[in-house]
Amino acid sequence: MVSRRKAPRSGQSEQWVLLAPESLSGDAKNLSDETVFVKLRAPFADKGAMFLFINSGQQICEVKAFHEEYRSWFIGQTVQQDGRLLIATPIDPLFLVLPYLIKADKEQGKFQPVEQIVVDEEFPSCGMLLQCTPVAKSLHHVTEEKEIGSKKFHKYSKEKALVWLKKKVDQTVKVLKSSKVCVGGGVQSATFIRSTQGSDVKEEDYTRYAHGLISEYLTEDLREDLSKYLGLPDLSSPTPEPPVKKRRVSDAPVEADEDYTKYNSDNKSRKSNSKMTAAQKSLAKVDKSGMKNISAFFSPKAKAAK
């Protein structure tokens, strides 16, 4: 649990409930100067996201919030109105630097000091990434380097980046297998039913699943390039349905194959067109002159004129 120094009007310190790595298990007061929340540009979208810098950036975590309506926390003898659950998961900071390297390569296409590459007016705290030891140690995985005197210059290398990302995918595949995470057709995401891992699961299923996880932190272009580099075939499109079945499930009105309005004529016309029996033929020959219709016997008599 992390607490802010700023206190609201009620005098109660503002707090959150945070699930974090064990490296943050010490007293929050002792870590307040070395551990901070920083808003940076998310590598997977052109918007801000919250990250946690632990021990002056020696470890960086992505922070996500689980929030439900009408939720609060009981902390000691107090009620914390903000009922969000913050979850901090470690992330390789090179994923946060990669979009800046790609952008600089597209715009300038030359070797530059990394301090001139990782610049963002909207998120000025991005400079803190360069103070992280993991970034300095891993830049060579995704860039070409030149050293002039004591100064290093970097330029994004797509080939190196794909090799580095493939290693990330391979590591993820190993974790998926060791954790017995179901992939492929054995997963039903709607209900999250874990079925027995069948023999039909292929290595490609693990690779595609791992690629999907890694791609959440990549730009769209790099995501597609990685898919091709891994040799993942495009997912086959669904088999086209027969024309009759298409028409049945279509939202368009069903079209009749025959004009059924010809059966809408009245009974009299149908009877006249039908074949008459012998009795009906004999009755038709009888002289009906002077005969009254049977309905005439039931009609009211006309009043005589006075």
Curated annotation (Swiss-Prot):
Q: What is this protein called?
A: Ribonuclease H2 subunit B
Phylogenetic classification of the source organism: Eukaryota, Metazoa, Chordata, Craniata, Vertebrata
Its family? Answer: Belongs to the RNase H2 subunit B family.
Renumbered residue ranges of the record's region Disordered: 232-285
Q: Where in the cell is it found?
A: Nucleus
| Assembly | The RNase H2 complex is a heterotrimer composed of the catalytic subunit RNASEH2A and the non-catalytic subunits RNASEH2B and RNASEH2C.
GO terms under biological process: RNA catabolic process
What InterPro entries does UniProt report for this protein, alphabetically? RNase_H2_suB, RNase_H2_suB_wHTH, Rnh202_N
